[in-house]
């Protein structure tokens, strides 16, 4: 994508009939605003426009709830009990829809499909968290397991800390060269400030290395880098 790139959007739920003009000046654009100011709705509208313009399979949107349906294995959400070892991410049909899935499941499917993405994410997990990751298919369903690098014991992704799931989701989307436009709602969710700074560096690197357009919304100062007044656009 060439910059500056201007989008004209209508977010009726937030701005009524008023047309909003948004200009992307580089490969990384950051939306900052108070709660309920319309950041998420604006991201979703941009998602729809980008999918229409360049193709649905070139655009990836990551929800702020990247844990998705994994949450019912982590927290009591109804009267039923769920065993983490039974957690599956989906079948081959779900995998084919990975770029439309807005939670971390889509990124685990990307790691299964693209071994280059798997290798890059695995290397960083080992360094950052002392973790190995394993992706297996069982009776037509994909399962993900983790284990410490100094142990042979494994456990389900549903039992892993949410910070790892969030980091993996974002890293896999950044490294997936199929994705030309990546929109991330609140990438800082569950992350320590040091990890937020690390992910910001990875985003900037991916924008340059893969010519990727990345748009994020955030409340975190760690996700905002201003070196000069000219970087504060409109």
Task: For each feature predicted by the language model, list its residue ranges.
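Coupling/switch segment of ABC-type P-loop NTPase heads
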Residues: 51-129
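Short beta-strand
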Residues: 133-138
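Switch/communication elements of ASCE P-loop NTPase nucleotide-binding domains
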Residues: 1-51, 139-234
């Amino acid at each position: 994508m060439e910059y500056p790139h201007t989008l004209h959007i209508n977010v009726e739920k937030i701005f009524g009939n008023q047309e909003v003009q948004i200009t992307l000046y580089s490969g990384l654009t950051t939306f900052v605003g108070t709660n309920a100011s319309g950041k998420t709705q604006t991201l979703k509208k941009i998602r729809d426009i980008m999918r229409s313009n360049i193709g649905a399979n070139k655009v990836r949107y990551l929800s702020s709830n990247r844990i998705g349906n994994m949450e019912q294995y982590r927290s009591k959400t109804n009267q039923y009990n769920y065993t983490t070892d039974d957690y599956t991410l989906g079948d081959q049909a779900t995998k084919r829809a990975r770029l439309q899935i807005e939670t971390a499941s889509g990124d685990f499917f990307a790691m299964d499909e693209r071994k280059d993405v798997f290798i890059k994410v695995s290397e960083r997990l080992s360094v950052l968290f002392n973790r190995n990751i394993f992706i297996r298919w069982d009776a037509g369903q994909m399962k993900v397991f983790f284990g410490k690098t100094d142990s042979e014991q494994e456990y389900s992704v549903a039992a892993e800390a949410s910070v790892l799931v969030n980091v993996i989701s974002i890293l896999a989307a950044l490294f997936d060269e199929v994705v030309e436009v990546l929109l991330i709602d609140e990438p800082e969710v569950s992350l320590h400030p040091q990890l937020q700074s690390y992910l910001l560096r990875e985003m900037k690197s991916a924008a340059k290395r893969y010519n990727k357009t990345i748009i994020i919304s955030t409340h975190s100062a760690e996700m905002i880098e201003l070196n000069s007044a000219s970087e504060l656009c409109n």
